[in-house]
Each structure stands twice: as structure tokens, then as C-alpha cells.
């Protein structure tokens, strides 16, 4: 049984593309540039590498404005990040302090730190109830891969999905955490 949160992200990328008026292919690159703290010029180049520097800065500003308008609460989050970045650290969802060296990186550190913490909690919960002779094979980014006897695969796949939800609940998140489990004999079968 295997699967991560990838399909959830794919759907969200399409939703963002539709809201902002860019293609699905562009939105993933642009979204990550935005979340990782790119300035307007870099954001514009993420949209189209062939733009002039001035045109990229203008396009980047348009994209930034569209994102902020399209995603409820984003403006407030960015303002809170700007204020909190002045102290030099972010408070992780598990209470740890994450050092932030530059203000424009604050949101990225907060998101990456939170995602890693949730994914690790997910792994811990899953491993508490492994099927007989079940083994974890890998943990890559937001994906857990396990092996087990075929007779346990369906039940274990359901447990993987439940454990993702429980990981989010562990941190009292307001947005649900979801995962989709897939069953196959090889890594390629589940991708």
C-alpha cells in the first residue's frame, strides 16, 4: 500500500489555476515561487521565462495581486508573516521554533516546517498499527510507501488514509488532512 498527498495537491493546483487565470502547468511553478518567497520579477519569470525583466516584474505583480484576491485569508496570513518575521523565527505547529534568516522566506519556512511535522506524525501513527510482517519502505516528501501481504493490503490502505486525517487532528488543524492510498506490486503501480 502506498500513497501520499499528491492527488490533493494536483486538485488544488487546478483550482488555483482557474482562480488566477493561468494554466495548470504554469500554476504549479508560479505557486511554489510565490510560497517560497519569490519577488515580483522572479514570479513573472516563473510564469514566462521569455519576458523582459520589466515585463516579468509587472506580470509578477499581477500574479501576486491575483493570488491574494483569489485565496481567502491570504492577505491576512502574509501580513502576519511579515510582522512575525521581525523576531527571526516562526512557531511551528508542534511548538518548535524555526529560525528564519530573511523575512521573504517566512511563509515558506512555516509551510515546509508544518508539512514535514504533519507528514512525520502521519508516519508515526501508521507505524503504530502495521499489519503482520508489514514494513515501511520509504518516506519521501509527502509519500509513505509500505509493503504487506496482499491479504492485508485493503485494510492497511484504509489505515493509511485514516492515519493522515489523525495526523492533522493531532495538531488541531482547521483544514482536514487527506491522503489517497493505492495498492500495487511495484512503486510504478501506485504512481
For the regions a language model picked out, list residue spans one by one:
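Conserved beta-strand -> loop -> alpha-helix junction used to position metal-binding or nucleic-acid-contacting
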Residues: 10-14
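Single conserved hydrophobic/aromatic residue that forms the stacking wall/gate
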Residues: 1-9
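Short Gly/Ser/Thr- and Asp/Glu-enriched loop/turn motifs at secondary-structure junctions
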Residues: 138-143, 174-176
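Histidine-centered divalent-metal-coordination microenvironment in nucleic-acid enzymes
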Residues: 145-147
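Conserved short beta-strand edge segments in small beta-sheet-based binding/regulatory domains
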Residues: 168-182
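Short amphipathic alpha-helices in soluble, non-transmembrane regions
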Residues: 156-164
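Conserved catalytic core of nucleic-acid polymerases
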Residues: 15-139, 149-152, 180-191
